[in-house]
Amino acid sequence: EALALNHLETDRFLHSAYASGLACLTAEERDLGSVIVDMGGGTTSIAIFMEGKLVYVDTIKIGGHRVTTDIARVLSTPIADAERLKAIDGSVMPAEITGIAPDPLREVVRLGRSDNITIPTLGSATEVIGQTIERNLLSAIIRPRIEEILELLQGRMKQAQMEHTAGSRYVLTGGA
């Protein structure tokens, strides 16, 4: 309806993961086989390309906003600040930053290993209270949700008997 109101016509509609695959993968990657994972705020989609063609597409209703709310809840910080933390300081691979292997959340808190990040916390409307956390703590909050999303996608591919179709080339994209 919005298209018609603006005097626009469509030739066809494309799944967002398919469009991401066309934009992000080279022709060779699409030919050899690749899985594109397109993580948005509310959904995460996958598209599998093989021999230059789209062979599978799926979407789950979990996206980057869940990661943001996890950060906000654990750190008692406003959603906007949690989003900034995720985008600027977030990582699922703390070893890449610190040279230390990833630890579960409880181990990060107990051991206190990595560099620090200062974040605002929820307080009264008239004052901003800040706290300092370790970068590995942020990673330990983010990593389980990303693992959950990837495991759900892997389960969907397995259910559709597509888990081995594209080999081991995965490309992550999206705005989340």
Predicted regions and their residues:
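Gly/Thr-rich phosphate-binding beta-strand-loop-beta motif of the actin/hexokinase/Hsp70
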Residues: 25-56, 71
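Nucleotide/phosphate-binding catalytic cleft detector across ATP-hydrolyzing
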Residues: 1-35, 53, 78, 89-96, ...
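Residue-level signature of catalytic and energy-coupling elements of molecular machines
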Residues: 3, 38, 71, 153, ...
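Feature representing long, continuous alpha-helical segments
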Residues: 69, 136, 140, 144-151, ...
